[in-house]
Amino acid sequence: MKKHIYALWAFFILFSQSIAASVEVRSTHMTTGDGVANNSIRYIYQDSKGFIWMGTLNGLSRYDGNSFVTYRPEGGNKISLIDHRIRDLEEDKNGFLWIATSAELFSCYDLKKDCFVDFTGCGEYEQLYSYKMTDREGNVWLWQDGNGCRKVTYMNGEFTSVVFKKENNNLPSNNITYISEDEQGRIWIGSHDGIAQVVGNKAVLVEENHDAFKMMSFGKDVFFLSGTGTISLKREGEDSRIVTRLGEGSKVYSTMRLQNDWIVFTEDGSYVFNLRTHQVSRDTELNIARGQVQIDNRGNFWIYNHTGKVWYVNAKTRFVKSFQLIPADKVNYIDEERYHIVHDSRDIVWISTYGNGLFAYDLATDELQHFESNINGFSHITSNFLQYIMEDRAGGIWVSSEYTGISRLSVLNEGAERVFPEDETLSDRSNTVRMINRMPDDKIWLGTRRGGLYIYDPHLKTIESSRYFDSNIYAVEEGADGSI
């Protein structure tokens, strides 16, 4: 009985619909015809209740697994979605969904009461802000280069906010480039004109004439990096001081931290600044000019620089692997590289590209698979110009595209491998398995529809011998004397 079950399972593995060597999926597609607000979906998010939210170019859609609800700006005095062009979504710890739009305006949606709310507490929710940061206490900081910033607090069921602006005499400059929190919980505001530390409801200038690019916290020390590679150090009770300059005023593109090393990517390559010793060296393995850094959902780094090549860096082990995801002849036609990366619950890394489809990298097998849209037949993605990717809590992979809707991929063959005795490109059912049997020596004998008899090692990895017969083999048995 066990042998028959084994044979049926092998037959299922071999003849399920395949899209790649080791990842087999089923896909469903949704467009405006199914209720999505717009076919160009720029962001996907699953909230704490399980709803899937889709930010599109013409409204916000909420999907419950069966139907859609669409939100768009409304007239009148009722608070509604502030703009129809959505670019980012995130839920905070109080159950509010923060919605960033292309108009540099934010909306805030109460997921418990199903309504939009005034997050400022004073009717100023139409102020321009481009970026958002949430501190460890749950306060939301909004800012824009030119309009200062706002600290939003939700407490006892009410929103209150504090505006930091030069005109209010509580901010040295309105031209904010970042707001960051250090390991001690202190808030730092970087601008094109210097660095300020938030003390109460006022930002106090700690360094002038510093075109702020990034802050890095190391214990009680705080380092500030300028847009031209100057690194300053601020210690408790001491004035800020310059500790080094990277190159000759090279333009900084991005940074990442690996243990005690702060890696800075500039126009002439990368530099390594050791946060403990303050020593600077050149990075030989990651000497990537104009490198841009993305961090995936596991905290690992992905670097790209408009060459179509992407470098993966494991944040804990520092392991580096590169992938050529977009050919050189294609990347020149793409003005802005757009990659989104999700490391899923199966240890498969999914990478969406803008212009060359979808990739899946299996960490266990070190195999990279490529999924493309095919206008001449069925495809699991509907465009090669992808805009976002997300894994839901059931393990489904959501892939959105530009102008062609969204796909949900379900992985079918978790823990299974496909075995092709014959050439896997054959379409004449030559790989139909007629017989499979484990012999007393643990070797596996397998017969195919073409009369082929294959002898595999005990793990079905290696063919040790093969021969063909004039008819199909349906059974095999070894006698007491060892004869077959």
Regions found by a protein language model. Name each.
Residues M1-I484:
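Carboxylate-rich, polar loop motifs that coordinate divalent cations or form catalytic acidic clusters
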